Each structure stands twice: as C-alpha cells, then as structure tokens.
C-alpha cells in the first residue's frame, strides 16, 4: 500500500497540470482514510515534493496538502508542527530562499498559499495555536497584506521601492545631461533655422515687401487725377492747388529739401491735405470757407465731365467696348525652384542647413522630448524642446514644399589619362644644348650598364613584337630611363635582362625535342633512382674525395693562403665511395581482425597487426568474441574484476536516483553508465517527467540565438585564426623594434 501511495503522489505532483486529476486524488483520499500510518507516510512524501526545486511540483503538492488539511486532524497536527518550514517553501518567508522557477507558477502558488493560510486561520485558528501564531507572524512581522491581490511581502515592497528609486536617479542624471546638451545646441539650432529662413526669403521673396500703395483710396485717387491733368480747365485748379500746397508746405515742413524729390511735382490729394492741415488753416474765416466750397464744387463738376470724356477716349483708343470685362487666370499652385548660376550658393547653404537639421538636430530634439516625457518632468526644458521641434518641422515642411531641383554634383577624380595629358604638355619643350642622351660604349660600364647588343659580334638582334600595343613613352620618361642616377634606368636594365633570359631559355629547352627524340623516349622509360656522389662520378677519378683543408692558424689574416694544407681522410673517402642498399623483404598484409566485443553487441573490425588502440593486444577469438586460449580468458576476467573493484559502491545509478528524489540534490546519476543495451534506456531516463517544464532548456530569445551563432565552435576558431594571423604579421613586421614588441 505504501508503494501505491508513493506512485499516486508522484503521478499527481509531476503531472504539470494546474488542477489535480480527480480520479487519482479520490483514490489517494480513500487510501489515507483507511489508516493513520498512511496519513503519516503521505505527509512525509508531500514534504519531500515541496522541497523539490520546481514550482509546478510544489504547486501540485500544495493542492494535495489543502485537500488533506481540510479532512484529517492528524494531518493538520503534523503540518502545523512544522508550519515554519511549510511557509518558507510556499509563501517565501525567507528571502534568502526564493521560490524555484518557473516564475509565473511560483507567483501563483504564493498567492494561493496566502489565501489558504487566511482561510485556515478563520476556520481552525481557535483550535490550533501555532496556526494562529503563524498567521499573525505573516501579518505583523512579514507585513503581508492579506487583502492585497498581489500579496507582496515587506522584502518585495522594499525591492520595488529600491528599484523605483534607482530608476528615478538614473532619469535625473539623464535629464540633467539632456538639459545641458540642449542648452549647448539650442544656439546652433536657432542659427540653422535663421539661415534656412534667410535662404527661403532670397529664393522666394514675400510679395508684401514690394507693395507700392499701402491704401486702396490712394491708388483710386491717383488713377482719377491722371486723366484730369490733360483737361483745359486744369490750369485754374492747378494754380489753386499749387498755392494751397505752398502754404501747407511752409507750415508742415521746415525745409522743402526734406520732402522726396519724386513727390514734389505731384498734385496734392484732398484727403492728405485736410489731414495734414495745421492750426493756422483751421482758424480761417467762414467766408473764405464758403468761397472755397463754391470754387471746389465748380471744379469738381468740370473734372467729372472731363473724366467721363477721357474714359470714353481711353476705350476708343484701345479698341475696348466697355469696362465690364471679367478675366479668369489659372495660377499654378505647384512650386518648383530650379538651380541656376544665380542661386547656386544659396541652394548649397540651404541644403547644408537642411541636412544638419534633419540628421543631427531633429533626432536629438526627439530624444530630449522622449526622455523628458519618461522622466515625468513638466519643466521649461520640455516646453522649449517642443517649441524647437515645431520650428524644425515647419522649416522641413517648407523645404519639402519648395520642391528644389538641384543639379547632381559630380566629383572629379584624377586618372592616369590626366597625368598623361600633363606629361604631353612637356613634349614640345626643346632639348638643352650639349645634352647627349646616348651614352658611348666605353662609358656604359662606368655607369653600371651592359654593353650594347648591336656591337657584340656573333649575335643577331631579334625583333620582338609585343602582343599588347604599348603606349608611346613621353620625353620625360625617356630622359629618366637614360639618366643612370634615376630609378627608371635601373628598372629598364632589369627588364632588359629578363627579356634576354626568357627567349634564350625557351630556345635551349626546345632544341632537344627537335634534335634528340630518341633520347627523350629513353629518358621517359628509364627508372628513376636517388643519385649519390658515387653514381655522379661513376667510373671517374675523384681528386677531391676524402681531402680536407687544415689550417695551422685559426687567425683570419696572420697566416697567408699558401700555408693551408690538405689532409686526406680515409673515413671520408670511404663514405663517398660506399653505397648502402636496403632490402626490407616482402610485405605481408594483415588478414586477422580484433574481434573484441563492443558495447552495442557487435565485434571490433579493426585490422591492426599487433595491438588494437581500444582493446589492447590482439588475441585469437571465436565467432562471438570470446578468446580461444584459456590464458587470455583468465586475463580479461581478472582485468574486468579489478575495474569493477575500483568503482565505489555508492555510485550505483539506481541508488543515486533514489537519493536524488529524496533530497532534491543532483548527484550525477545521469552521467553514470546505464545497464542495458541500446540508447532507449538513457532516452527514457531523460524524459522521465515529460509533462513538467524543462528548466534546463534555454529560452528562445534573440540573445540566445546570437550566443549560439557568435560562440559557435567554428566561429570561434575562425576568429582565433584571424587574430593569430594578425599577430603573426605584426610580429614579422615589427619584430626588431622594441617599442612595438612591448605593446
């Protein structure tokens, strides 16, 4: 029955489900109801499962504890006697022993445990003093708010407060740096905005800046006075207006020169005259006013008649039927600025300022606003940043609306053709007097040059036709090649030597093929053997064989060369004239196999001559791998017994697995050899509880994927080889320089 209880508890706690299996739980309750010993055994099994480092196992075990706590007095007594350990394993009262992963399941179990303890206190608190003490301990000492849904302890609150305080300090430092940066860059941003605005005004001036008439009444009165100046009755009004203007000018202006010259001869407007009249004119008598009114009335009637006549004459002269014409003009709203020689500099400055705003200042202002918003500061810095952002947006929008069409800037790169053109400029320069580019033959040796090929007897000059057409050298290059002190002369000499050596070698190599075809055939069929001095001088006298120079004095210059003596050595002569020929014998291939039994049940197929690197000395075996000789069988049995005796008794995989289940400590049972054949047993042991969350499995995050690629064995080897090559090149380059060697 105890075995049945253990199996039920293990199945229920390792299911990995959020809710227990009702049938299994009912069967467990039925067994516990039969005897108190079973309850005691179940209690120890559940406490063992609560000590497991897996939150899903603890949650299932806690659910079983809740079911049995409500139905058994003995189980309540056993649990309350060890209530402190129970709270540490479920409520996390000891912050040094946090709940195991997965984190979500652990948090769920903690909330459920606190609610359950509160229910137990309300139901059984009066009967069990330790339960009441545990409840007050959680409430008063651990500061657990049982009404709080999150059920945070005092340690959790303290951690949250420290985290929040740390974040606030970080944001304060960032805001301080951003404010200082904004103060430094604000002047530059305003300067760029002002520069863009000035460029906009230069490219598209405002029409209001060029308005001549500021009032429609002035424009209408000016248009009306123009035709009246042509009438015959204008002389009378002109004299009156001139007198009137003269009097007003004396009153309103101290000096007539202050009045603009373009407005001196214009007739004064009635509205302007009345508005600029002085106090002396206002004091005129009523009689003068009435006479002026009558005169003005007569002048007005005459001017109206003249205006009508001039209007009809204007229509007749211009071929117009009437003034009642309506013109509809279609004005294109699409704006486009084309680049020309007049606005190139302005556009360049505008584009530079636009690039600076868009690529540097715009991202900086956005980051400032984002930082100030996250920090929650409603200071002047945030308002200033928002205003600057609006100004930048307006400038960028205006630049986009202008639709600027700029020419593509082509960057001119100096090429070899440009250098040739520069060299061609010097071709027409006359040579200096007395300069002889040709070096005589008797002076060529003094300059380090070979004698000319044309003067050597018995040699015919060969005419070489290059495959690639060469560029005709310039006069400057020819002069450099003829000057023996220049590097060009040395290069030309080396090229000439190589050109002479190549045709000669090819010609000599081609002669045997045409002249001695039989010799070539014999050489191809002849065997090749290593050649020594004895074969090299076969059948010839070797005068220097076995002779050595003996120096009576080891000094470099005290003894003359004639004093050197030759000594014959018989040993050296014997070595030169002796030849050793090895006769290894006939090769016999290996026909036997190792045939030692393998762990997978097969036999070793290695064909070594004397010793197998895996199974030792090769001995004759039968078809199933058992040694034929009795001595070999006894030796293998003795070695196997000694190997088993070296292993410790407690390292039994099954015993280690049971200890790990009871204590929750990994003793390394998975690394021990498993009894049985094949790989199925090991696979089943690894997946003993497939429903539980695998804690060793890494989360599939971007960091883990990058780590898998970066720390891959092949990648690491490639990086190491590249670094070694770089160090090797650096060492080869600066090996003899102590300054670089110490770095």
From Swiss-Prot:
Query: Biased composition, Acidic residues: where in the chain?
Result: 417-428
Q: What is this protein called?
A: UV-stimulated scaffold protein A
So what family is this one in? Answer: Belongs to the UVSSA family.
Q: Which GO terms describe its cellular component?
A: chromosome; nucleus; site of DNA damage
What organism does the record attribute this protein to?
A: Xenopus tropicalis (Western clawed frog)
InterPro entries, sorted: ENTH_VHS, UVSSA, UVSSA_C, UVSSA_N_a-solenoid_rpt
Positions of UVSSA-type zinc fingers: 591-618
Q: Where is this cross-link: Glycyl lysine isopeptide (Lys-Gly) (interchain with G-Cter in ubiquitin)?
A: 432
Q: Which residue ranges have biased composition labelled Basic and acidic residues?
A: 283-300, 429-447, 510-522
**Where is this protein found?**
Chromosome
């Amino acid at each position: 029955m105890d075995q049945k209880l253990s199996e039920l508890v293990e199945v229920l706690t390792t299911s990995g489900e959020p809710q227990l299996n009702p049938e299994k739980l009912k069967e467990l309750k039925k067994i516990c109801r039969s005897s108190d010993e079973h309850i005691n055994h179940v209690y120890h099994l559940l406490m063992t499962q609560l000590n497991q480092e897996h939150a899903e196992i603890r949650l299932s075990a806690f659910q079983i504890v809740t079911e049995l706590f409500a139905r058994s007095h003995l189980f309540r007594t056993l649990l309350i006697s060890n209530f402190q350990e129970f709270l540490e394993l479920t409520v996390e009262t000891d912050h040094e022993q946090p709940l195991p992963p997965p984190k979500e399941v652990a948090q769920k179990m903690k909330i459920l445990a606190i609610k359950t303890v509160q229910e137990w206190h309300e139901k059984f608190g009066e009967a069990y003093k330790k339960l009441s003490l545990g409840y007050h301990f959680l409430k008063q000492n651990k500061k657990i708010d049982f009404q709080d849904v999150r059920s945070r302890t005092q340690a959790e609150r303290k951690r949250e407060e420290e985290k929040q305080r740390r974040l606030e300090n970080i944001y304060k430092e960032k805001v301080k740096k951003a404010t200082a940066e904004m103060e430094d860059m604000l002047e530059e941003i305003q300067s760029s905005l002002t520069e863009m605005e000035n460029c906009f005004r230069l490219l598209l001036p405002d029409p209001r800046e060029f308005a001549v008439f500021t009032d429609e009444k002035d424009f209408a009165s000016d248009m009306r006075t123009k035709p009246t100046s042509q009438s015959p009755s204008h002389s009378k009004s002109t004299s009156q207006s001139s007198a009137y203007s003269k009097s007003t000018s004396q009153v309103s202006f101290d000096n007539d020169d202050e009045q603009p010259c373009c407005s001196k001869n214009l007739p004064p407007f009635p509205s302007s005259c009345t508005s600029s009249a002085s106090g002396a004119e206002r004091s005129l008598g009523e009689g003068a006013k009435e006479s002026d009114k009558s005169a003005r009335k007569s002048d007005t009637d005459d001017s109206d008649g003249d205006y009508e006549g001039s209007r009809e004459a204007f229509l007749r002269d211009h071929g117009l039927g009437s003034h009642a014409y309506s013109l509809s003009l279609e004005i294109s709203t699409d704006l486009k600025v084309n680049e020309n020689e007049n606005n190139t500099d302005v556009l360049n400055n505008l584009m530079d300022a636009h690039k600076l705003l868009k690529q540097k200042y715009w991202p900086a202002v956005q980051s400032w606003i984002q930082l100030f918003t996250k920090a929650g500061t409603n200071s002047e810095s945030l308002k200033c940043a928002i205003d600057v952002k609006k100004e930048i947006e307006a400038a960028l929008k205006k630049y986009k609306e202008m639709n600027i069409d700029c020419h593509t800037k082509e960057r001119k790169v100096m090429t070899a053709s440009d250098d040739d053109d520069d060299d061609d400029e010097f071709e027409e320069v006359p040579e200096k007097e007395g300069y002889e580019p040709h070096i005589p033959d008797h002076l060529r040796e003094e300059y380090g040059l070979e004698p000319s090929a044309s003067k050597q007897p018995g040699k015919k000059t060969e005419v070489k036709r290059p495959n690639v057409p060469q560029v005709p050298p310039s006069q400057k290059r020819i002069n450099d090649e003829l000057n023996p002190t220049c590097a060009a002369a040395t290069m030309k000499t080396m090229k000439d030597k190589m050109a002479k050596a190549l045709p000669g070698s090819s010609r000599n190599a081609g002669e045997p093929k045409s002249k001695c075809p039989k010799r070539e055939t014999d050489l191809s069929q002849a065997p090749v053997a290593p050649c020594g001095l004895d074969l090299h001088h076969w059948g010839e006298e070797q005068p220097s064989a076995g002779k050595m120079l003996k120096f009576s004095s080891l000094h470099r210059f005290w003894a003359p060369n004639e004093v050197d003596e030759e000594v014959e050595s018989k040993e050296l002569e014997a070595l030169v004239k002796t030849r050793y020929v090895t006769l290894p014998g006939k090769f016999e291939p290996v026909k036997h196999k190792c045939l030692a039994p393998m762990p997978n049940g097969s036999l070793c197929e290695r064909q070594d001559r004397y010793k197998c690197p895996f199974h030792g000395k090769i001995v004759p075996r039968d078809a199933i791998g058992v040694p034929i000789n009795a001595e070999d069988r006894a030796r293998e049995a003795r070695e196997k017994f000694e190997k088993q005796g070296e292993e410790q008794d407690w390292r039994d995989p099954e015993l280690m697995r049971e200890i790990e289940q009871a204590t929750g400590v990994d003793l390394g049972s998975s690394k021990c050899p498993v009894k049985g054949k094949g790989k199925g047993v090991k696979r089943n042991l690894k997946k003993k509880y497939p429903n539980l969350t695998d804690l060793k499995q890494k989360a599939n995050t971007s960091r883990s994927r990058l780590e898998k690629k970066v720390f891959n064995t092949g990648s690491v080897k490639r990086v190491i080889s590249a670094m070694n090559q770089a160090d090797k090149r650096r060492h080869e380059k600066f090996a003899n320089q102590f300054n670089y060697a110490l770095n």
